[in-house]
Design a protein with these regions (language model features):
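N-terminal Sec-pathway targeting helices
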Residues: 3-20
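C-terminal cap/linker of serine protease catalytic domains
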Residues: 24-27, 36-39, 93, 97-106, ...
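Active-site substrate-binding loop(s) of clan PA
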Residues: 38, 68-70, 90-96, 120-125, ...
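A short, Trp-centered hydrophobic/proline-enriched beta-strand micro-motif
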Residues: 41-58, 66, 161
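A conserved glycine-rich beta-strand in the N-terminal activation segment of trypsin-fold
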Residues: 53-83, 116-120, 217, 240-242, ...
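Catalytic nucleophile loop of clan PA
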Residues: 68, 210-231
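Catalytic-histidine neighborhood of serine endopeptidases
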Residues: 75-127
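Flexible, gly/ser-rich surface segments that form the specificity/activation loops bordering the active-site cleft
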Residues: 145-203, 212, 233-243
Length: 256
């Protein structure tokens, strides 16, 4: 069987569609500065994300992490930002095995109340590239607030930063995690450096702000609640083979 080829015109059209989508989301919604809230209040923009790939035989593979809302201040939100690797299975497997494997992404406002929405992946960049995904909710909601962005060039080593999210090691010690705003954890530290991680194309802030599995995709905010980065990874100590105290967040300019 001859493989179906995509013409150069089709490729250009698809590329322009993606560029147009990103510009539409962030040109209108990705507002810089003006957070006007403390880091604790920024929890009101954070969500828990559950991603799964499955087939009709009951087999599945799941991932989870954190996301956060973007939009115009004071208006309902419809877009969520997270890491690409948080939703990778739900996006990539259906692409590789159409009509055999299906994907689902759920955005939770409160798992305890079974309050969630099915989201559509409208932009996806894999872990080896930008490692960013944009999710679109079925309709605008007031259950979360939009977080403002801070230009990356204004962030300097020594700046205070706070990581928000749902780290698995913290949730595992709770008898009944709710995955709501009250379950969002906060860790504090400083920006150490700006670098590029091996095997990726994005720039990241190196930091001593503690993050763990489950924090992926969550916002790294400043003392005014502005998002400086997207929490993404922790370095391994090559001597011990254990996780180190060196952590990374994708700079927010990679999003805009």
């Amino acid at each position: 069987m001859e493989a179906k080829k995509t013409s150069s015109k089709q490729v250009v059209a698809i590329l322009l569609l993606v560029i147009g989508l990103i510009a539409g989301v962030f040109g209108i919604l990705g507002l810089v500065g003006g957070g006007g809230m403390d880091p604790y209040e920024a929890r009101n923009g954070v969500v828990y994300i559950y991603s799964v790939a499955y087939n009709d035989q009951g087999q599945s593979e799941a991932g989870w992490g954190t996301g956060w809302a973007i939009g115009k201040p004071g208006e309902p939100v419809q877009y969520i930002v997270t890491n690409g690797h948080v939703v990778a299975d739900a996006y990539e497997y259906p692409q590789q095995y159409p009509n055999e494997i299906f994907g689902s992404v759920e955005v939770y406002y409160s798992a305890a109340e079974n309050d969630f929405a099915q989201a559509e992946i409208v932009y996806y960049s894999p872990q080896t590239q930008k490692d960013i995904a944009i999710l679109r909710l079925p309709s605008p909601t007031e259950k979360r607030i939009a977080l403002s962005l801070r230009e990356s060039d204004s962030v300097k080593p020594g700046d205070t930063a706070y990581a928000l999210g749902y780290p698995g090691n913290a949730v595992a010690n709770q008898p009944l995690p709710k995955y709501d705003m009250n379950d969002v954890t906060m860790t504090k530290g400083i920006i150490s450096n700006r670098t590029t991680l091996t095997g990726t194309t994005y720039e990241a802030f190196q930091m001593d702000v503690s993050i763990a599995g489950g924090n992926s995709g969550g916002p790294l905010v400043d003392e005014s609640g502005n998002v400086m980065g997207i929490n993404v990874a922790t370095a391994y100590d090559q001597t011990t083979g254990q996780l180190s105290d060196v952590h990374y967040a994708i700079i927010i300019d990679e999003l805009t």
